[in-house]
Design a protein with these regions (language model features):
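Phosphate-binding active sites in nucleotide-utilizing proteins
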Residues: 187-263, 273
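Glycine-rich phosphate/pyrophosphate-binding beta-alpha loops
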Residues: 308-313, 350-357
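Cysteine-nucleophile active-site neighborhood
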Residues: 233-306, 358-367, 371-375
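Proline-centered loop/turn at the N-terminus of a beta-strand
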Residues: 104, 188, 263-265, 281, ...
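RNA-binding accessory domains that recognize and position tRNA/RNA substrates
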Residues: 1-206, 212-217, 244, 355, ...
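Catalytic beta-strand/loop cores that center a nucleophilic Ser/Cys/Thr
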Residues: 303-343
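Residue-level structural signal for beta-strand termini and adjacent loop
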Residues: 16-17, 55, 310, 340, ...
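Active-site-proximal beta-strand elements of phosphoester/diester hydrolases
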Residues: 188-193, 307-308, 346-350
């Protein structure tokens, strides 16, 4: 048994199929119909519980190769967990996977009702425990826990030293990831790692870039010197967890990188940090965008792309003063992509690497390559 307490006073008891213990986090919902392993291992979900709208979870098991990172969300909530998995690439059940990673698994709850609650109230803090089942004690645990915006999440998921990435995109012929070949690399880019997904790095290297992964706290001077010495050709700012406004030191460093006119590309949190660094602070959405079925309009081509998304924050409309808006979300008209007028920078809020999700936005990685050619 596992007990749940939400900050709106809702108390539930359900079945546990993951790790044991007590976890506190922010509750969000995800509308993806597949790719639960990639969702669970996405560093952007650090400190969060994920409710899946897909009612049946576990049918393809899990494997040792599709993780986005070594980090995980706090827990997942599903309507029905299927222990009997069937997939040629599966190595173990989802239950075994969650236990190995220390992730709580909660099933037998009315996920439809929970998602409606989140749509009404917005994202809610929650505590879940396989150890403590007293409502009042769970309420006290939640009351004393820090809000997600006050937690140092990025530092817990970022690289601790400069490293290289060793593979590229998934090969559907071999059903495996292609190893990185130095001979196919034309330019080297620095990746500021705020919690980068593995498949973002795969796609960067798949378009002929070599990704050098730098810790989130890397000083701007170090990167500027590397650029001036032609050791790197540009900078990529990754996705990551938490409130971008909490990363004040990183924002100060990004300001210097912008002033140095280094070509840059940001995704998700990186997109938000580029906006904040230029004086346009982000705002929080009521319940965020989480899923692999979000329609986004490319304002240049008028094409509608179905995208993967995972964010609770957005850049403001005022960004149009210094940037051309390139993409908009068709659910709520929020900004999904920009090209800056004052610097060689492009950024998007959604995830063009998908994983999970459609691959309709993969061209954005090639746009970054084209941007680099001018410098």
């Amino acid at each position: 048994m596992i007990s749940l307490y939400l900050e709106n006073g809702l108390f539930l008891q359900a079945q546990s199929f993951g790790a044991s213990g007590t976890q506190v986090g922010e509750l969000v919902f995800n509308t993806s119909m597949s790719g639960y392993q990639e969702v669970i291992s996405d560093p952007s979900y650090k400190g969060q519980f994920v409710v899946f709208s897909m009612p049946e979870i576990g049918v393809v098991g899990a494997n040792s190769k599709d993780d986005e990172s070594f980090f995980s969300c706090a827990g997942i909530l599903v309507r029905h967990y299927n222990e009997f998995f069937s997939n040629s690439r599966a190595d173990f059940s989802l239950s075994a996977y969650l236990k190995e990673r220390g992730v709580l698994g909660i099933c037998g709850v009315d996920t439809r009702s929970l998602i409606k609650t989140l749509r009404h109230h917005g994202c809610l803090m929650m505590v879940a425990s396989t150890i403590e089942h007293d409502k009042n004690k769970l309420e006290e645990i939640l009351k004393n826990a820090p809000r997600i915006s006050h937690s140092p999440l990025v530092s817990s998921v970022s690289a601790q030293k400069i490293t290289t990435h060793q593979r590229t995109a998934f090969d559907f012929k071999t059903l495996d990831y292609k190893p990185f070949d130095e001979k196919t690399s034309h330019k080297i880019i620095a990746v500021l790692d705020f919690g980068a997904k593995g498949n973002i790095l795969n796609e960067l290297q798949n378009v002929g870039l070599k990704a050098l992964i730098y810790p989130h706290h890397t000083k701007a001077n170090e990167l500027i010197k590397a650029y001036e010495k032609k050791e790197i050709s540009g900078i990529f700012l990754s996705n990551g967890p938490g409130d971008p406004l909490s990363l004040q030191q990183e924002i100060e460093e990004i300001k210097q990188l912008i002033n140095a006119k280094i070509p840059m590309f940001g995704i998700c949190l990186g997109h938000q940090l580029l906006s904040i660094a230029q004086g346009y602070p982000t705002y929080k959405l009521k319940f965020g965008h989480h899923g692999s079925n979000h329609p986004v309009k490319n304002l240049k081509t008028n094409a509608v792309e179905i995208t993967a998304q995972n964010h609770n924050y957005c850049v403001p409309e005022e960004i149009e003063e210094i940037a051309i808006i390139t993409h908009r979300n068709l659910f709520d008209n929020t900004i999904e992509g920009v090209r800056y007028k004052n610097a060689p920078i492009i950024s998007v809020q959604h995830h063009p690497e998908s994983s999970p999700g459609p691959k309709e936005s993969h061209y954005i990685f090639k746009e970054f390559v084209e941007l680099l050619k001018g410098f």
